[in-house]
C-alpha cells in the first residue's frame, strides 16, 4: 500500500467555485459530472485515493450535489471503500465535511 497515489484536489481551483445541482442536464458543475468525470476513475483504480479541499468555494454544496456525487459513490462502492478512497475538508467551512458525510450515510442506509 505504500505505493498508493494520493491526489490532492482543490475543488474551487480545479473544478468550480460554484458547485451546481444534482444532474448535468440542470447546469454546470453538477454532482453527477464531478462524480463521473473526476471521481469515478479514482474509485476504479485500486491504488489511487483523493483528498478534496473545498476551501474557497463561493456557494456551498447543495444537498442534491452531495447526494448525487458522494452519496451515490458510497452506495455503489460501499462505505468502507468510500472512506478509504476519499477525504474531504474545507479550511473556511469545517462543518462541510460533516454535511457531506450526512448525505453519504443517508444514501448508504436507504433501502433500494
Give short role names for the model-derived ranges.
Residues 11-50, 54-102:
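Amphipathic alpha-helical interaction surfaces in cytosolic regulatory modules
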Amino acid at each position: 500500500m505504500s505505493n498508493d497515489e494520493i491526489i490532492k484536489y482543490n475543488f474551487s481551483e480545479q473544478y468550480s467555485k460554484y458547485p451546481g445541482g444534482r444532474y448535468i442536464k440542470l447546469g454546470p458543475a453538477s454532482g453527477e459530472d464531478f462524480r463521473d468525470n473526476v471521481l469515478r476513475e479514482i474509485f476504479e483504480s485500486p491504488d489511487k485515493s483523493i483528498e478534496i479541499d473545498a476551501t474557497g468555494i463561493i456557494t456551498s454544496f447543495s444537498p442534491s450535489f452531495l447526494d448525487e456525487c458522494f452519496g451515490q459513490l458510497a452506495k455503489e462502492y460501499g462505505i468502507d471503500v468510500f472512506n478509504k478512497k476519499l477525504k474531504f475538508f474545507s479550511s473556511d467551512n469545517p462543518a462541510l465535511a460533516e454535511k457531506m458525510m450526512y448525505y453519504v450515510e443517508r444514501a448508504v442506509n436507504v433501502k433500494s
